[in-house]
């Protein structure tokens, strides 16, 4: 945790941008060859976290993994099966070798709060939850590539004692005592909510996680801003935004299927509103769906292998590159960068900047023109760029003197309309920042 309380960092102090991918069924449905193929792809693209579940959503207590192993060796679900967890070990180790962190859910939410799904609800007492948490904590105590995620698409209300027991068990397993500084723990809630709605003051909750519920017409920035304003200060991110190629609001006939624009929209509005990172998801990938092998859940469009190269998977990585190309820990949300109307809905513009004013960024979802308060950027001379969020390419607008531009300046993105979203980057020329993003000579698989 960075001392400022807004961002995550590596143990050596380097910035850690949480760029997650959703692979809930990774341990449950893949072979080791498939897991390696998937993890190598995500590492190559630039993801930093893979979210996966030990006791999986898709009937993970009664349907065995790809090698025929169930997670428990007894019908009472009390004795972990070493063969099952040895495979989890192997996948976690493979991820570590590729520089990936595993966002590890001990169990999907139906295992402690049924509401829907196959269950069964096996964690009905604090003792059982603490014992399983301790088992996993001890098993992975030497691993440095794990972030713990409790929950799993359920509200925590009424289950607070169970969650405290899970967290206590994990901490005691990792550190030998109830020391929450030894392990990062968060909570994955159900749709259109945040862990902060219930759990913000829990000592075990290191940062807040949200889920938007796979809707499109959703004011993403407001919920991030709400968690950003909570005290004590804790980082926040969306751990389940709308998945790429997911039925929008679970109603394909009425709203269609999500695409790369929906992915980008969630990323930029939320990160620019103060999120410490973001999670991407693809509808086929989270369930590791292959035709003829598993029953599909709400109609994936193509297999998980084909889905690895969807445009949104590249484009969130371009977003990470943009954020990391400027001073990381000083970044703050600031709608004051936008002079006048910031817009609403799909015409929204969202701004972020350096707290010292050496750079500012504005995301225009529909490519509409907007005015900038130049007083929010330091320096007598300012360098301006457009960042193409579809390709990760920067386009230099030019350099100008502040006194010639006046107090405000209007910028018109190169294109406009649905799917023509852009980021404006303004730099204090004295800083000599490089072009925004990673600036490769060419990109592939990114258009869309």
Identify the function of each model-found stretch.
Residues 3-219:
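Active-site mouth of glycoside hydrolases
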């Amino acid at each position: 945790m960075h001392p400022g309380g807004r961002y995550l960092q590596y143990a050596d102090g380097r910035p850690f941008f949480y760029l997650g991918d959703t692979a809930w069924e990774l341990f449950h449905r893949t072979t080791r060859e498939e897991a390696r193929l998937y993890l190598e792809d995500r590492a190559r693209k630039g993801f930093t976290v893979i979210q996966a579940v030990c006791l999986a959503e898709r009937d993970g207590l009664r349907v065995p993994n790809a090698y025929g192993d169930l997670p428990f060796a007894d019908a009472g679900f009390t004795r972990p099966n070493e063969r099952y967890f040895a495979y989890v070990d192997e996948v976690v180790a493979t991820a570590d070798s590729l520089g990936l962190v595993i966002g590890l859910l001990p169990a999907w939410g139906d295992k402690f709060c049924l509401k829907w799904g196959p269950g069964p609800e096996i964690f009905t007492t604090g003792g059982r939850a603490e014992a399983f948490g301790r088992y996993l904590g001890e098993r992975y105590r030497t691993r440095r590539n794990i972030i713990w995620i409790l929950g799993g698409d359920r509200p925590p209300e009424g289950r607070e004692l169970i969650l405290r027991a899970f967290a206590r068990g994990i901490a005691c397993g990792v550190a030998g005592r109830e020391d929450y500084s030894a392990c990062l723990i968060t909570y994955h809630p159900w749709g259109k909510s945040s862990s902060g709605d219930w759990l913000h003051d829990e000592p075990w909750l290191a940062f807040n996680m949200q889920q938007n519920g796979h809707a499109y017409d959703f004011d993403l920035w407001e919920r991030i801003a709400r968690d950003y304003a909570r005290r004590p200060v804790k980082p926040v991110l969306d751990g389940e935004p709308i998945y790429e190629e997911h039925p929008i609001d679970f109603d394909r006939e009425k709203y269609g299927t999500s695409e790369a624009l929906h992915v980008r929209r969630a990323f930029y509005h939320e990160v620019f509103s103060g999120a410490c990172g973001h999670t991407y998801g693809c509808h086929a990938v989270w369930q590791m769906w292959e035709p003829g092998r598993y029953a599909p859940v709400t109609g994936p469009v193509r297999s998980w292998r084909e889905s690895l190269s969807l445009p949104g998977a590249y484009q969130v990585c371009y977003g990470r590159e943009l954020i990391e190309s400027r001073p990381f820990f000083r970044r703050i949300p600031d709608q004051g960068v936008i002079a006048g109307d910031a817009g609403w809905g799909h015409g929204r513009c969202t701004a972020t900047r350096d707290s010292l004013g050496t750079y500012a960024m504005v995301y225009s979802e529909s490519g509409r023109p907007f005015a900038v308060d130049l007083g929010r950027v330091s320096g007598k001379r300012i360098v301006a760029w457009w960042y193409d969020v579809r390709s990760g390419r920067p386009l230099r607008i030019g350099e100008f003197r502040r006194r010639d531009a006046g107090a405000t300046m209007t910028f018109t993105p190169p294109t406009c309309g649905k799917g023509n979203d852009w980021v404006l980057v303004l730099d204090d020329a004295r800083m000599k920042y490089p072009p925004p993003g990673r600036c490769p000579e060419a990109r592939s698989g990114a258009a869309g």
